[in-house]
């Protein structure tokens, strides 16, 4: 399985994704482009050991200008104004989070997970 890391230290972004409340995941770089169209696990990080909290299908990737971000995508991404994840400079990459399914019980990320940079990994469960 493929998993995407979502920092949830201050805001439960990973849970918001799998519960269907966070419709877009945003990144400063196009780090999830290889995952568009794939079913992935959402890995909650920032609160101890990484946990897989559910699954989504990653939809279209689009570069969103700062103006578009401020107009609509900030709200769809559940990112508060002034947060460390707020858009700066030219804008951000936004990925649709489709068909979310939360797990009844989170699963510990296996220790043998193969990381692909800081954005995602592969593992067997």
PLM ranges: what are they?
Residues 1-125:
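Structured alpha/beta reader/binder surfaces that contact nucleic acids or chromatin modification marks
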